[in-house]
C-alpha cells in the first residue's frame, strides 16, 4: 500500500512556550507526523495529544541563537479528533511553528526507517 498524505494543519505563535495544532477525524492506525520549527534554537520538551498517542522524536537540528527543527511521529494513531500540544524546554518564550500531518499506508510500528544528518 502506498503512503498517502490524508490531511495537514499548521499553527504559528510569536512569543510562546506552548502551542497546539489539531486534526479532525484522524483514522485509527494512521501515522501522525509533526515538524516543530523554533526560534533561538530552542528544543522541544514534550509532545502530547488529546488521544494519548505516544510521540517519538525522530530527528532534530539546532543552530544556537537561530533556528531549531524537530521531527516527531506517533505510529498507529488511536483515531478521532486529535489536538497536539507542544511545550518548549526554554522558560522564555520564542516564536515557533508546528506542521501536523496524517498519513495512511505506512507501517503502524517502527515507521521511522532511517535518519541522516550532516
Which residue stretches match the model-derived regions?
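Function-critical acidic carboxylates
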Residues: 1-118
